[in-house]
Swiss-Prot record:
Stated name of the protein: Elongation factor P
Organism, as annotated: Orientia tsutsugamushi (strain Ikeda)
GO cellular component, one term: cytoplasm
UniProt-listed NCBIfam families: efp, PRK00529.1
GO molecular-function terms, A-Z: translation elongation factor activity
């Protein structure tokens, strides 16, 4: 599907130079005093991980990759693969572990429903839920009289991840974590 360079957003996947590229940063729109406006894109190759910077005229058209989305349930890890089950056909598939960012892998909990985006039947990207509920395994003791302030303390979660939490939380409590930037949201209800 052709898309105008002006309409490209961060996270879009493009077909460019016979490869798939993800736009890894917000496009930089520039209109110099002399000459036409252009768009500067930082793109990352989905296969090799190499980054390139390309400049396109704002009137250029690029090929946006058409991705298919299906819901799967995460079952378990096996060596360098994740085992997922299709929620409609109950077929199991293996997906490379490298398809997901290493800092988000600990938050992929068993039986979590995720979306797998495929291009020509090849998995390209996993879309995790926006938030997950995890338990605080270890943190410094509760501070009496602590209220919601700007000061945070480190905590180790049940999945092994480290995160900063407010001082009024203690070990054993469940919290909601936003996966976009791996940050504390609130106590789990």
């Amino acid at each position: 599907m052709k898309i105008l360079a002006n309409a490209i957003r961060e996270g879009n996947i493009l077909e460019y130079q016979n490869n798939l590229w993800i736009v890894s940063k917000k496009p930089d729109h520039t209109k110099p005093g002399k000459g036409g406006a252009y768009i500067q894109l930082e793109m990352k190759n989905l296969k090799t991980g190499t980054k390139i910077y390309e400049r396109f005229s704002s009137s250029d058209y690029l090929e946006k990759a058409t991705l298919e989305q299906r819901n799967y349930q995460y079952l378990y890890q096996e060596n360098n693969h994740l085992v997922l089950m299709d929620l409609e056909s109950f077929e199991q598939i293996l997906v490379q572990k490298s398809i997901i960012a290493s800092n988000k892998l600990p938050f992929l909990l068993e039986n979590t429903v995720i979306t797998v985006e495929t291009y020509k039947d090849e998995p390209i990207r996993l879309v995790l839920p926006h938030t997950v509920v995890v338990e605080i395994l270890e943190t410094s003791p509760n501070i009496k009289g602590a209220t919601v302030t700007a000061s945070y303390k480190p905590a180790i979660l049940s999945n092994g991840a480290k995160i900063m939490v407010p001082p009024y939380l203690s070990a054993g409590e469940k919290i909601v974590v936003k996966l976009e930037d791996i940050s504390f949201v609130e106590r789990a209800k």
